[in-house]
Structure formats: structure tokens, C-alpha cells
Amino acid sequence: MSDAARPLDPDEAARRLGPWLGAGGQAGGVVLAVSGGPDSTALMGCAAALPPRVPVLVATVDHGLRPESGEEAAGVAALAGRLGLPHRILTWRGEKPRTRLQEAARAARYDLLLGLAREAGAGAILTAHTLDDQAETVLMRLCAGSGPAGLAGIAPARRLGGLLLGRPFLDLPKARLVATCAAAGWPFAVDPGNAAARFARARLRRVMPLLAAEGLTPARLARLAARLRRNEAALAAAAEAARPSLAAAPAGPGRLALDAAGLAALPEAVALRVLADAIAALRAGERRPERLERLEEALFGRILPAIAAGTPLRLTLGGALLDLAGGRLLLAPEPPRRRTKRAG
């Protein structure tokens, strides 16, 4: 049996889950996100076998997108009961969008999980994302034209609404979790949507073996993501360090002002991050950031040349109005557009 398809042994599972679930783990306990697929089923089974542990609550989100989803959620509940773990089914209610369905389902899933974790007083949510998920995410974002932040992929751990979101299996091939379920006799479901050609992730999944044959393996894609996460951390620190020296005269409520010459003197990557962060600060609460291509075109194609030439500039970008004049770049929320009434 190859290492890529070897089941997790109890010691390895304990090393991965111990920091989260062990006696010194998250205060208040942990919520496990378990869909019923092999990855999350392995997470649940391994967690149940780990003594001593903090309180563990298993949660299954029923998105209501497939007729069999309710039955699958009930199957997770039954297995959780046999393993001695409490279980809750969370239902995504309301009308489902016609576009960006997977994106909307993901947002709803995390909202429901976060709500349950807060209700239970849990300190963290664990998901069973794998090396395969990481590789597919990096490839999808590469196809979408993402920059370093997007290509950094899925973080092993991050903050989510004041809690921790952890992914203890992120560097494991999916085949190992499938093998773990098979060895333990834990039943799991297979979502047919994972192979549906209408979804970009499923289409890319089909070509992954061809890419791997050329050397672009899931492990190498995941390694690229790890390297870019390190670079992103350094870039964020550089932008944070530069920000105080860029503060221009007070800009007024709800506005930001940057010293134009100071912005132009920064390394391009740092200047781009400073601009992106400034726009994001004006758009607090909005989930979707401005596309990197537009930021690059605005900064490198218009703003920096105008600073060098000493000419004023006015443009809108990402919901912000940018006004370059008097040696400073003023950023303000873009005013709402007026609708003109048609005559007659």
C-alpha cells in the first residue's frame, strides 16, 4: 500500500487533532463540520477516538440542494451517535440563488456553523479540507487570474467571527481519509455534485491527473500556496509598517489621505497592498475585494504616472473615489449614482 493511500493510525490522528481537541485544546470545545463525505467522516471518527478531549459537537449543514441531502444528514447523525458524539443538523433555508450557487452555499454554511459554535460556547470550528482541496483551490484561482493572496490558497487556520477555523487534514491526500474510513468501517456518502461538469472545480478535478503527469502535482500546488502565504505575511507587515509614514493631513470623516510621494517611493508590491487596504477600509463589511487586475491598472497605469508627472487625477476604483491633488491621494466612498428619468 502506498503512503498516499495509507489509513491514519491512532498516533498520527492524535498528533493532528490533539492541539485542537486535547485536554489543553480550545476552551469551550469544538464544532466539527461533517457533511458525510469521507474526509469529514474520518475527522469525526478520529475525534471520537481521541481521549481525553474537550467537548465536541458534530454539525451537518443540509443545504437542501439535492433530494438525498436530508437522508445523508441523518446518516451522519446516526454514525455520530454510535461514536458517542452529539450532533446537530443545520438547514439552509430560504430561496437559493440562480448564480454563484456554490459560493452562496459556502457562505451560508459558515454562517450556520459560526452561529452554532457561538450558541454552544465553542472556541473553534474544524473542517476536513485536504491536500486535494488545496490543490484544486490554487488551480481555480490561477485560472481566475488571482494574485499572491488568492494563490496562497486555504489557510490551515484563521479567525472566523472571533473564533478559530482549523483544518487539521489540509496536508493529507484525500485517499488517506477514504482509506481511514474503509479500515474503520465508517460509512460515508458521495456527493454527485463533485463530478458535475457545470462546476469549475469538478472540471478542473478531471484534468488534475494530466497535470500531475507533467509534474504539477497536488503536493506541488499546495507547496506553492504555503510559500505564497509566507510572502503574503511579509507583504502585509511591510504595508503596515509603511502606513504611518504615508498618512497625510486629516482627510475628514469617512475618508483617507495618503502622501503621494511616499506612496510612489514604496516598492510596487507594497504600494499595491497599501492601496488595496485603503480601499478595503472604506468598504468595511463588504466581502468581495476589488479585482487585482483593476488595482494594478489603476496604480501602475494611472496613479503612479500622474504622481511622477505632478498632474492631478480623479478616478473611481472599487467603490472608492480617488482624487490626486496637492501632493496627496484622497480616498472617499464613491457617491451613489443618480438614475435619470426618461422623458415621457
From Swiss-Prot:
GO function term, MF aspect, one: tRNA(Ile)-lysidine synthase activity
UniProt-listed CDD domains: TilS_N (cd01992)
Keywords of this entry: ATP-binding, Cytoplasm, Ligase, Nucleotide-binding, tRNA processing
GO biological process: tRNA modification
One GO location term (cellular component): cytoplasm
Catalytic activity: cytidine(34) in tRNA(Ile2) + L-lysine + ATP = lysidine(34) in tRNA(Ile2) + AMP + diphosphate + H(+)
InterPro entries: Rossmann-like_a/b/a_fold, TilS/TtcA_N, tRNA_Ile_lys_synt, tRNA_Ile_lys_synt_N
Its biological purpose: Ligates lysine onto the cytidine present at position 34 of the AUA codon-specific tRNA(Ile) that contains the anticodon CAU, in an ATP-dependent manner. Cytidine is converted to lysidine, thus changing the amino acid specificity of the tRNA from methionine to isoleucine.
Domain notes per entry: The N-terminal region contains the highly conserved SGGXDS motif, predicted to be a P-loop motif involved in ATP binding.
Family membership noted in the UniProt record: Belongs to the tRNA(Ile)-lysidine synthase family.
Protein name, as recorded: tRNA(Ile)-lysidine synthase
